Regions:
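Conserved N-terminal beta1-alpha1 strand-loop-helix module at the mouth
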Residues: 1-78, 82-85, 89-91, 259-283
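Short, well-ordered coil/turn segments that N-cap beta-strands
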Residues: 14-18, 53-56, 86-88, 117-119, ...
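Conserved, mostly hydrophobic/aromatic
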Residues: 20, 58, 93, 121, ...
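Active-site-proximal loop/turn and secondary-structure-junction residues that shape catalytic pockets
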Residues: 24-28, 62-66, 96-98, 125-127, ...
Length: 291
């Protein structure tokens, strides 16, 4: 199966739009890292396994693995292999984008068949279409893309909302994404060339769905970033497909608010609660969870 088929099958079998962002953060005075006594891969895999019945995919944030050097990259390879063994779709949150030859190397690293191979990748469109061409080429071999269009962070509007001719810059990017994906629309009416649209900007999300009627929307912002379930499902179709909602810290670090402090147990409860809250929001909006 290709990326869209695998993702849709996972969503339907688990009745979910939820995915897990695997963000094993570095220890700071304000942010917890990996629990004491846990190897990095063990912590991530325990949370992934616990959340697996309630999520369609994982989205490892590569920076948190890269920051730990060789040990971190070995852990990333182990985490991806473990997730694939559970039948989960894997999305590399890499936000790559460079001149053609460099992008080709990134595409080989994360959309090829090596240690860090994933089903899809997040990419940065700032360098233009020639920089994204090597990634788009991988769609033909069954991979997926999520292009940064309107991101969830507070200062995203500094550039993304600037007025280009006749529309904001982010809308111009969305129109390009629609063009890149139009040749790959499959049986579900969805293209594997998707977009990242933050739930923290629901009005933008509604407009994005108009511009991207066939794209799968990767939705950050739910959970620790403060977006509501109602805002997070704006881009989902009536059948619940076409959108996946990410949560990272609220699942990875749910154990900090639990009585027993066990990462897996707390993550499972948080993932179930997330799935059910999003499904309630879908129904309230006149939509249905994926079935």
């Amino acid at each position: 199966m290709d990326f869209v088929e695998r993702l849709v099958a996972a969503q339907r079998s688990k009745h979910t739009v939820a995915i897990l962002g695997v963000d094993p953060q570095l220890d700071t005075r304000t942010t917890p890292g990996v629990p004491s006594g846990y190897p990095l891969a063990r912590f991530c895999c325990e949370v992934i396994e616990a959340c697996a019945p309630h999520i369609a995919a994982i989205k490892p944030q590569l920076a948190f693995f890269e920051a730990r050097g060789l040990d971190g990259m070995r852990a990333l390879a182990e985490v991806l292999k473990f997730a694939r063994g559970l039948g989960l779709v894997t999305i590399a949150d890499a936000k790559r984008g460079d001149i053609g030859t460099t992008s080709a190397a990134y595409a080989e690293a994360f959309l090829g068949d090596g240690d860090f191979a994933c089903d899809a990748i997040t990419i940065n469109p700032y360098l233009g279409s020639d920089a994204l061409a090597p990634f788009v080429a991988r769609v033909r071999s069954g991979r997926g893309l999520f292009v940064l269009v309107k991101t969830s962070n507070p200062s995203s509007g500094e550039f993304q909302d600037l007025e280009a001719p006749h529309r904001p810059l982010w809308e111009a990017v969305a129109e390009r994404v629609h063009g890149w994906g139009s040749d790959f629309i499959g049986a579900e009416g969805l293209t594997p060339v998707g977009a990242v649209i933050g739930a923290t900007y629901p009005a933008h999300a509604r407009r994005a769905r108009e511009l991207l009627p066939d794209s799968i929307i990767l939705v950050p912002g739910y959970g620790a970033q403060g977006a509501s379930a109602e805002d997070s499902i704006v881009t989902a179709r009536a059948d619940g497909l076409g959108a996946i909602v990410n949560a990272s810290r609220s699942l990875m670090y749910a154990y900090l608010k639990s009585s027993d402090g066990v990462p897996g147990t707390a993550a499972a409860a948080a993932a179930l609660a997330m799935r059910e809250e999003l499904n309630r929001a879908l129904r309230a909006a006149g939509k249905s969870p994926p079935t």
